[in-house]
Amino acid sequence: MAEVRARVDFKVGAKSNIDAEILSFHGLQSDKEHVAVIFKSADTTQEAPLVRMHSECLTGDVFHSSRCDCGEQLEETITRMGQSGGIILYLRQEGRGIGLYNKIDAYRLQSQGMNTYEANNHLGFGDDLRDFTEAAQMLQALGVKKIRLVTNNPKKIRELQEHGIEIVEVVHTSAHIKDGNENYLKAKVSHGKHQLKL
């Protein structure tokens, strides 16, 4: 059974002005170092807090890559939760679960004309290798059973529900279109069935 290992106050956001806590866990299914960020304005005792499961994306979250919308989705969520509260589960599942180096290999194939899913498949991987079991374990460790989920991805909805988390509302993120990510977003909609208005 997963439990909170440590929790520490810190400030987040583009200007480091949003009060939050970062939590680590032990007892998760794998040895991945997933964390939760709880925004101070969040009341985790409320019936259904706002929750986003965000898979690590070094290229988008840190370097603001033009190839994806991950960094923008994270910033949008931080801003929203800074105002109204919520919980971000930051999951160490780089490249939809294929890892950073394999993702860079997939980028090379995308530069040659493949979409994000075709590139992963060409490298011998499935469309999406992420597993959200540990996200459900993290929520259970926090005593959260009902949530309002921030996502455009039906896989996240389905997997959380399969692990006993009740989703009372799905809140979609905006479409973050920029030069270089149009084909990526189109593939997410057509192939990944993401609920995204382009």
From Swiss-Prot:
Q: What is its EC number?
A: 3.5.4.25
Q: Which GO terms describe its biological process?
A: riboflavin biosynthetic process
- What class does this enzyme belong to in the EC scheme? hydrolase
Q: Has the keyword Disulfide bond been applied to this entry?
A: no
Pathway note:
Cofactor biosynthesis; riboflavin biosynthesis; 5-amino-6-(D-ribitylamino)uracil from GTP: step 1/4
Protein name per the record: GTP cyclohydrolase-2
Q: Which reaction does it catalyse?
A: GTP + 4 H2O = 2,5-diamino-6-hydroxy-4-(5-phosphoribosylamino)-pyrimidine + formate + 2 phosphate + 3 H(+)
Which amino acids does the record list as binding Zn(2+)? 57, 68, 70
Q: Does the keyword Secreted apply?
A: no
The record ties this protein, via HAMAP family, to:
RibA (MF_00179)
Tell me its family: Belongs to the GTP cyclohydrolase II family.
Textual note on the cofactor = Binds 1 zinc ion per subunit.
- Briefly, what is this protein's role? Catalyzes the conversion of GTP to 2,5-diamino-6-ribosylamino-4(3H)-pyrimidinone 5'-phosphate (DARP), formate and pyrophosphate.
Mind listing the UniProt keywords for this protein, alphabetically? Answer: GTP-binding, Hydrolase, Metal-binding, Nucleotide-binding, Riboflavin biosynthesis, Zinc
Instruction: List the active-site residues.
Output: 128 (proton acceptor), 130 (nucleophile)
Taken from the UniProt entry, a GO cellular component term is:
cytosol
An annotated Gene Ontology molecular function: GTP binding
The entry marks the following residues as binding GTP, namely: 52-56, 73, 94-96, 116, 151, 156
Q: What does this protein need as cofactor? A: Zn(2+)
**Record SUPFAM superfamilies:** RibA-like
Instruction: List, alphabetically, the NCBIfam families matched.
Output: PRK00393.1 (NF001591)
